[in-house]
Swiss-Prot record:
Gene3D superfamilies: 3.30.160.20, Ribonuclease III domain (1.10.1520.10). GO terms for molecular function: double-stranded RNA binding; metal ion binding; ribonuclease III activity; rRNA binding. One of its GO terms (cellular component) is cytoplasm. The lineage of its organism: Bacteria, Pseudomonadati, Pseudomonadota, Gammaproteobacteria, Legionellales. It comes from Coxiella burnetii (strain Dugway 5J108-111). This is Ribonuclease 3. The keyword Lyase does not apply. Its cofactor is Mg(2+).
Amino acid sequence: MNHLNKLMERLGHQFNNLELLKIALTHRSSGADNNERLEFLGDSVLGFIIASELYQRRPQAREGDLSRMRASMVNGDELAQMSTKLGINEYLQLGVGEQKSGGKRRRSILADALEAIVGAIYIDAGLETCRRCVLNWYGERVDDLSKLSPKKDAKSLLQEWLQARRLPLPTYEVKITGEAHAQTFTVNCYVKGLPHKTEGVNTTRRRAEQIAAKRFLELLDDGKGDGITERDQ
């Protein structure tokens, strides 16, 4: 019995070309034949599938709201959690250094692997099979699309707050530390003419920027930062 059979059962697809699945599970630290190209493809396919569902289920929603709802469905946290739920982490092929540093638990690696698998299924069986698999993975979240709130992220809210007051847009200064396989991003957010300066630290640049933006909002007099998300939306 192939050791990938259990994973394919969880994914809901038996690959005709098993090599595609193997590549989708191979991180760049493990060799040249890795999942980066499949991840590139899968990112677009996944975005299209969710966008299509939102378009059909939310006929009254505006373009900006649809974009924010799609982003909340395909952000790194969401994909990493789904990847773990499907047990993809158990099958990842990592280089020795990445393996020792806990790569099988790293959010970005888990999310990228899921997108790569989406790309692999698309190549192996086409869009409709890929759509069926993806919607099955999301489960009840798909049924909730008709109720999903188009929550704005911190960076968008900060930009709107500043534009409404004819103030300059924020500047995000980024400092990167650590090895290539385990980078830490430190982002400082400030606005010319305002006294505030905030910092966000995370393993991805976008989340660090969101954290810094949220903290900046919380310093503003009207409490604009309350109840918003730091998620990478």
